[in-house]
């Protein structure tokens, strides 16, 4: 009798989970060319796509500035892509628009602009077979970055499950070439999970980079609803753990979006698990629905709540935490802090 009840309860739970996924967007919904009537919605500059009034703390000015224009033109000329533009980041004016180019930060997206996965929060294009890698991309990227005179650059990629190594060699080669041409530039990589292959994680971690980042995105309980089914919470945790195993003094970093309906207990548990694998830096930002095909925003989290999580993370021993409605994984204020930490470390090694 008890066995039958447990089986029945398990079946109901599985059915509810399947129903929830079926009601949400599927992988096919994100495939390139299948957008249909789902027009893009700017996550900050337009009204909320969920029918909710956008809180005042999420409104920002239209990005502008000569430096922003110059960096955009440089990218076009070299055929490079940035996640800043692909993901319509609200901080692009802050990161690109300053008068001092050496203070500017840019997040370059490698291996094309089309991902093999279809996460339910992400606006990047999706296709099962994005096409071959550009063999000239590592060199072109290194040349462009060294010419710009940027002090800190973030390299990220779309997921490339179609490649045997997930693109890890291509990624690592880009880092090495940048360091050869401009060793003073600090390089942060924001990688995918390489399908959990720890050898591929090690390839990237040992490339000479300064910061290894991989985003958890959300709490464990919501991961199957928010991310592509090939991405799991524990798999992502193992990626961050392996980066530290490969290079113990490497700074590791992750990012979490709030507003999916997570509970405080779930966020607390996530922070504890991250500290358990030695993650140094965590960022919190508000999830914004990029198009009507994507998950709805469950909650607009208040600035006060973001402040709470910033303090909680620091109390738990994280080296740094950037937390705010408009904070994104590659956030300029966080990069300035990391840059100072790395410079102090390098100076200490030189003594």
Curated annotation (Swiss-Prot):
The keyword Mitochondrion applies. Pathway: Protein modification; protein lipoylation via endogenous pathway; protein N(6)-(lipoyl)lysine from octanoyl-[acyl-carrier-protein]: step 2/2. The keyword Transferase applies. Its EC number is 2.8.1.8. InterPro entries: Aldolase_TIM, Elp3/MiaA/NifB-like_rSAM, LIAS_N, Lipoyl_synth, rSAM. It is found in: Mitochondrion. Pfam families: LIAS_N, Radical_SAM. It catalyses: [[Fe-S] cluster scaffold protein carrying a second [4Fe-4S](2+) cluster] + N(6)-octanoyl-L-lysyl-[protein] + 2 oxidized [2Fe-2S]-[ferredoxin] + 2 S-adenosyl-L-methionine + 4 H(+) = [[Fe-S] cluster scaffold protein] + N(6)-[(R)-dihydrolipoyl]-L-lysyl-[protein] + 4 Fe(3+) + 2 hydrogen sulfide + 2 5'-deoxyadenosine + 2 L-methionine + 2 reduced [2Fe-2S]-[ferredoxin]. This protein may be expected to contain an N-terminal transit peptide but none has been predicted. NCBIfam families: lipA (TIGR00510), PRK05481.1 (NF004019), PRK12928.1 (NF009544). HAMAP family: Lipoyl_synth. Belongs to the radical SAM superfamily. Lipoyl synthase family. This is Lipoyl synthase, mitochondrial. It comes from Yarrowia lipolytica (strain CLIB 122 / E 150) (Yeast).
């Amino acid at each position: 009798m008890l066995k039958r009840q447990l089986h029945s309860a398990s079946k109901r739970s599985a059915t509810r989970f399947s129903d929830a996924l079926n009601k949400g967007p599927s992988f096919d919904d994100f495939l390139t060319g299948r957008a249909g009537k789902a027009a893009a919605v700017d996550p900050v500059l337009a009204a909320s796509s969920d029918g909710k009034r956008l809180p005042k703390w999420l409104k920002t000015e239209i990005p502008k500035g000569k430096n922003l224009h110059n960096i955009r033109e440089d990218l076009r000329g070299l055929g490079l892509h940035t996640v800043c533009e692909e993901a319509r980041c609200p901080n692009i004016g802050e990161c690109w628009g300053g008068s001092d180019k050496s203070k500017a930060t840019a997040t370059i997206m490698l291996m094309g602009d089309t991902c093999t996965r279809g996460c339910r929060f992400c606006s990047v294009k999706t296709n099962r077979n994005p096409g071959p890698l550009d063999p000239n991309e590592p060199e072109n990227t290194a040349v462009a970055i060294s010419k710009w005179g940027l002090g800190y650059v973030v390299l990220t990629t779309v997921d490339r499950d179609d490649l045997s190594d997930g693109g890890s060699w291509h990624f690592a080669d880009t880092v090495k070439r940048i360091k050869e041409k401009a060793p003073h530039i600090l390089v942060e990589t924001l990688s995918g999970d390489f399908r959990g292959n720890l050898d591929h994680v090690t390839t990237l971690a040992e490339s000479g980079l300064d910061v290894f980042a991989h985003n958890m995105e959300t709490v464990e309980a919501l991961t199957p609803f928010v991310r592509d089914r090939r991405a799991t919470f524990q798999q992502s945790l193992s990626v961050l753990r392996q980066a530290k195993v490969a290079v113990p003094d490497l700074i590791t970093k992750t990012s979490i979006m709030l507003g999916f309906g997570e509970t405080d207990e779930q966020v607390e548990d996530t922070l504890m698990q991250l500290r358990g694998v030695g993650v140094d830096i965590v960022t919190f930002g508000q999830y914004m629905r990029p198009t009507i095909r994507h998950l709805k925003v469950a909650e607009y989290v208040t600035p006060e709540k973001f402040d709470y999580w910033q303090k909680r993370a620091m109390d738990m021993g994280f080296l740094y935490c950037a937390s705010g409605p408009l904070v994104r994984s590659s956030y300029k204020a966080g990069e300035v802090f990391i840059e100072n930490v790395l410079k102090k470390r390098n100076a200490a090694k030189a003594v």
